[in-house]
Amino acid sequence: MNIMTILLMTILTTFLACNKSEEQMPTTTEILYTMPEESEAHEGTWLQWPHQYQYGVAYRNSLDPTWVSMTKALVTSEKVHIIAYNQIEKDRIISLLNTASVPLTNVDFKIYKTDDVWVRDNGPIYVKDKNNNLVIQDWGFNGWGNKIDDQTGLLIQFANCNLIPSKIATDQGKTIIDINSIMTNEGGSVVMDGNGTLMACKSSILNNNRNPGMTQAQAEAIFTKYLGQTNFIWLDGQAGLEVTDQHIDGFAIFGDQNTIVTMEQNDLLDYDVKQSDINKLYAAKKKDGTAYTFLKVPLTQNNVVTTNGTNLGYKGSYINYYIANNKVLVPNYNDPNDAVANGIIQTLYPTRTVVGIDVRNLYENGGMVHCVTQQQPL
């Protein structure tokens, strides 16, 4: 084989490798799947229970009460699918729930190894196909772009969490739609209004640490094909601001098809949302071109202090709530504004009861209620 032949083969191999992802991009805007809006009727909710095997016993114990509270609120109207690391953890969780007088009738346990608790980002995405069959999509999870642990200086490991969608699909006998080679996308990076509009920050999607070289047009084509969304509200976001590169669901979500739930401008600025993004958010339009109504919820009055007395140095957001069948689980912080926020959010859901969930210790690790829940529609 001469040098010229080797050179040509090398060029061809490189060309094919570089274009693999482009070949897999949707070439049309045909809608193959539609994601039910979060507030539609649930079969259940998925939780990945904290354990000791990645971050230790103190981490696990600090988060247990939040998971017990969420389970207690959810079991009254839907299944709670609890992912336990192993049988020892399952037995421990059952003991915790029994101690808290949580009935186990609606609790379903799965034993899967996990790395952490963020099922919104790594968990199954349930969608309906053209025949109205419920299937599971696996969008891949690489730890928000292969992030480095600040304390250890090592790559954060999420190989176990990345397998959760396929394990659930196998156990449930559901079709798995593997989107890993097309796009990497966390559940918390997108919110949808239930009427064809998706809102997201570019920083957590059009980022080389997830989707190298992907354009906005390509991302929109994927979201149209696989989630059924045709109208897009893009904020720039800020790459590197925190571990997620600024997920949208921390500061802006859809309350319903006509309402965006967010904060006043000063609170958004305090929450590190850029002024240019605030302007885009407030100017957002529905699929039909009309404006949304805005429901604005304040930040906490004070900086969040964990249950062990650690002052985090920043305020808490109430936007990252979760809508269950007959409850709305709202992050709470032992703050005077808990009651204010709960009351404001309650006005949007008159047929559901708002339940405050203490997330102070979870918030220290970057998340709230929506981040650690994942709905399974009927």
Locations of regions flagged by a protein language model:
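Positively charged n-region of N-terminal signal peptides that target proteins for export
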Residues: 1-5, 19
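Bacterial N-terminal signal peptides
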Residues: 5-14
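Bacterial Sec-dependent N-terminal signal peptides
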Residues: 14-32
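The feature marks the mature, well-folded catalytic cores of soluble enzymes
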Residues: 26-378
